[in-house]
């Protein structure tokens, strides 16, 4: 899914100095959270929701190209490589913004960055609507890419810094939820405008009003209090905290923020590549994890869903767009329980389950596609039939009838059909004589649409077509509970607070870069080896990601950030992790199970878990 910088802001769980004293004081009074951490009123919630609208815009822009490409490639007669560039140009802009976005956000503020990204998205969408050439289309997509990358970082940082401690995870997760809702909205839009003349313009234009409204609303929201402290405006920060927490005195939280900012200056960017606190191992774990997020193929399913579904039997634009809408529905349904249950199940467990199910569904998809006798090597070219090409050339040609003239349109369809029936016999004689004006006209139409023979949709068994769609939906669901949201949670936990933001920026750039490479070559690779073998390659990558997660990713459930950092700081962390897994499994699975009372089983489980934790955290290791 989309990379977001899940910056925790001030670590309120276990800070040094003042933070520890504050924690002890409120626990001594019997309260679970300090007063300033409990303040999550309606204003804080509405501010978070307003900022999270950026996620909706990001998801919409990521998903809308799936259906718009079906119309644009015919209108502009795009080649395979040009279609890949239309899709990937957004990622080029996102990659550029990820390299500089952190500096812009720290200099001008999180709120200002969100306002700027919303305005830029509206401008880019306007360029797309008015674009009449391939070059202008690329420029508009790059502008939107810059916008969504900047907003992805700024939104999560802003929400994390205005949210109270015990609601930070929930409020930050609103952005991820809004992203998948945006993807679903894009697929619905694809279906709604699939058969509308110039429907792609409506698809691109729907987000403009929402972007403008968000920019206006964000203008009236307060800046991040953490950003104000960074700029030396402690008085303004205190007022903002009082408004967000509904407290008259926010001195304690302000002290914690200042303390955490001092800790951040202990690390430099280059410490990520040094052995200090085993940071080199941590960044390699992070970079490899985001590599598997992209190399398992999910971005291609997101961008090319309608194209892939069209190649496996959903022949019309409307049918392919409707089927891809199911992808958006599944993403939303799967993301909600993953977000709610991650604190109880654990991110590593979700990653393992997701990778396993992804591999199984991809194998099924590949086998099914092998049995669908279609020309997979032409997936990237236009699949319009000669009938559709002639109809569109008569009805929708420049200066001809509009889509609203139904009576005349039906009349001219009859003329097109008559012309088509008279031209089809001539097509068979082109190779023999090649001397008819009508045959020349037909050849011009054929070259314009890159026509090739495609198997009749009726030749594809309905069972195989729907099994392919079902496998795709299972694959999307598995990604949405595993490699979609969980890597960004893991990345926010394995780095110390003082360097977490820079580590997230680096992994975010890696994520966009690999996404660009994969999306830029998907149609070309599919054109060379076929869709089934692409699925099998993704299967191997999913299994490799499962092995990597099992061996290298720590289970952070129930651990404080300091405990996680302490374990990862060990030089021989990887060796200890593998050995711990084998010993822990031997102890938890007795050779001769015996029936015992539930109380005895609970005591034994607590005993084994206690031994496992002591082994993991012992100084000897």
Swiss-Prot record:
It is found in: Cell membrane; Endomembrane system; Cytoplasm, Perinuclear region. Residues 1-48, 106-119, 163-176, 223-282, 343-349, 492-502, 554-621 are cytoplasmic. The chain crosses the membrane at residues 49-69, 85-105, 120-140, 142-162, 177-197, 202-222, 283-303, 322-342, 350-370, 471-491, 503-523, 533-553. It catalyses: D-glucose(out) = D-glucose(in). It is a multi-pass membrane protein. GO terms for molecular function: transmembrane transporter activity. Glycans are attached at residues 375, 387, 400, 405. Residues 70-84, 141, 198-201, 304-321, 371-470, 524-532 are extracellular. Keywords: Cell membrane, Cytoplasm, Glycoprotein, Membrane, Sugar transport, Transmembrane, Transmembrane helix, Transport. GO terms for cellular component: endomembrane system; perinuclear region of cytoplasm; plasma membrane. PROSITE patterns: MFS (PS50850), SUGAR_TRANSPORT_1 (PS00216). GO terms for biological process: circulatory system development; D-glucose transmembrane transport. InterPro entries: MFS_dom, MFS_sugar_transport-like, MFS_Sugar_Transporter, MFS_trans_sf, Sugar/inositol_transpt, Sugar_transporter_CS. Pfam families: Sugar_tr (PF00083). Belongs to the major facilitator superfamily. Sugar transporter (TC 2.A.1.1) family. Glucose transporter subfamily. Insulin-independent facilitative glucose transporter. This is Solute carrier family 2, facilitated glucose transporter member 12.
């Amino acid at each position: 899914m989309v990379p977001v910088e899940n910056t925790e802001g001030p670590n309120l769980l276990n800070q040094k100095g003042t933070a520890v004293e504050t924690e002890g004081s409120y626990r001594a009074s019997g309260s679970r959270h300090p007063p300033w951490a409990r303040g999550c009123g309606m204003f804080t919630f509405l501010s978070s929701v307003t900022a999270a609208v950026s996620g909706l815009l990001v998801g919409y822009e990521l998903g809308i190209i799936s259906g718009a490409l079906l119309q644009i490639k015919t209108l502009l007669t795009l080649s395979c490589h040009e279609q890949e560039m239309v899709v990937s140009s957004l990622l080029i802009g996102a990659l550029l913004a990820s390299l500089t976005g952190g500096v812009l956000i720290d200099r001008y503020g999180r709120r200002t960055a969100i306002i700027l990204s919303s305005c830029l998205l509206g401008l880019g969408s306007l360029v797309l609507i008015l674009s009449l050439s391939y070059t202008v289309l690329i420029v508009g997509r790059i502008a939107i890419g810059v916008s969504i990358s900047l907003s992805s970082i700024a939104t999560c940082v802003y929400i994390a810094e205005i949210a109270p401690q015990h609601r930070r995870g929930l409020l930050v997760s609103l952005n991820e939820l809004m992203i998948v809702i945006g993807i679903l909205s894009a697929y619905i839009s694809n279906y709604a405008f699939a058969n509308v003349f110039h429907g792609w313009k409506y698809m691109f234009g729907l987000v403009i009003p929402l972007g403008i409204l968000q920019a206006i609303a964000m203008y009236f929201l307060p800046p991040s209090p953490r950003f104000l402290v960074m700029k030396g405006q402690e008085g303004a920060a205190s007022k903002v905290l009082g408004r967000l927490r509904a407290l008259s005195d926010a001195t304690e939280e302000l002290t914690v923020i200042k303390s955490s900012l001092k800790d951040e200056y202990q690390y430099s960017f280059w410490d990520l590549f040094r052995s200090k606190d085993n940071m080199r191992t941590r960044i390699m774990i992070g970079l490899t994890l985001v590599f598997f997020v992209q190399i398992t193929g999910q971005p291609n399913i997101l961008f090319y869903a309608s194209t892939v579904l069209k190649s496996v039997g959903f022949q019309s634009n409307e049918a392919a767009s409707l089927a891809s809408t199911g992808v958006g529905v599944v993403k939303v349904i799967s993301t909600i329980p993953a977000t709610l249950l991650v604190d109880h199940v654990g991110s590593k467990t979700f990653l393992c389950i997701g990778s396993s199910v992804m591999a199984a569904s991809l194998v099924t998809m590949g086998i099914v596609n092998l049995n669908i006798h279609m020309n997979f090597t032409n997936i990237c070219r236009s699949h319009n039939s000669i009938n559709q090409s002639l109809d569109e050339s008569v009805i929708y040609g420049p200066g001809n009838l509009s889509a609203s003239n139904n009576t005349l349109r039906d009349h001219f369809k009859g003329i097109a059909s008559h012309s088509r029936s008279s031209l089809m016999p001539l097509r068979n004689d082109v190779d023999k004589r090649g001397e008819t004006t009508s045959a020349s006209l037909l050849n011009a139409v054929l070259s314009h649409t890159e026509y090739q023979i495609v198997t009749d949709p009726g030749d594809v068994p309905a069972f195989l077509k729907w099994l392919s769609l079902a496998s795709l939906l299972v694959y999307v669901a598995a990604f949405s509970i595993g490699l979609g949201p969980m890597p960004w949670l893991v990345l926010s936990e394995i780095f110390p607070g003082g360097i977490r933001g820079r580590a997230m920026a680096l992994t975010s750039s890696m994520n966009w870069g690999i996404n660009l490479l994969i999306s830029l070559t998907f149609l070309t690779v599919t054109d060379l080896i076929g869709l089934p073998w692409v699925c099998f390659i993704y299967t191997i990558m999913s299994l490799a990601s499962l092995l990597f997660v099992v061996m290298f990713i720590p289970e952070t459930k129930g651990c404080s950030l300091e405990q996680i950092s302490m374990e990862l700081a060990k030089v021989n962390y990887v060796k200890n992790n593998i050995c711990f897994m084998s010993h822990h499994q031997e102890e938890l699975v007795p050779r001769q199970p015996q029936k015992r009372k539930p109380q005895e089983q609970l005591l034994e489980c607590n005993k084994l878990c206690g031994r496992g934790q002591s082994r993991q955290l012992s100084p000897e290791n």
